Amino acid sequence: MVQLSSGPANLAKTLRLMAGHDLVTEGFQEGQVGSSAMPHKMNMRSCERIGGMTVVLKGYLSMVTDLTGDQWNEGDVSCSVVRRVALPDSFFVIDGLMQTFITVLDDFGLYPQVIERELNHYLPFLSTTKILSAALNKGMGREEAHEIIKEHAVASALALRNTDVGDNMLLHDLGKDDRFPLTEKELLQAISEIGTGLVQHQINAVTADVEALKERYHEAENYIPQPIL
């Protein structure tokens, strides 16, 4: 059950981090209170609950493993008292965790405009490896290219943090640097394809597994979770 909870717990933590940057939401119901002290807050309450229930499950796992190698000639009450608490309660906890997780997935939402702004803000930094490769393809030495890119990247990052410059100027500044072999237009072309690696392949693999499970368990496809208190 701890292993089963690890996926929802990890995603819940990721969503909490993303929500901190206003990228996503788990849904905020009418009448829900995010914080009794700060009325504006819309805390990821359900994701926080998933994290807490995962900790509870790990606690029960710790209780049960403490019985390992600690019995005398036979089991006794010191063993059964732990089992009687940990075993049934673990099922209650994993049930509540999964009910909550399904609700989070059902009510999940994202904010594309905020995501686009963040992508535009950080994409030049995330693409410095591509920029470095493009410079090498132009015949520039690796160490020299690395140093120039680092120089402008640090300057751009500090400008974004300390001034009202607004836009990430890394590509503009690199393109204007006579020491660097690419123009701003060439740099934009070099990073135009956002690198997502094997993400699409992984999505397709997971989707195929889900479809197989749906074929096997038809009733699960339309399951409606119990209301969250």
What are these regions (language model features)?
Residues 1-61:
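Acidic, glycine-rich loop-and-beta core segments that form the ion-binding/anion-interacting portion
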Residues 23, 40-229:
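Glycine-rich cofactor/substrate-binding loops
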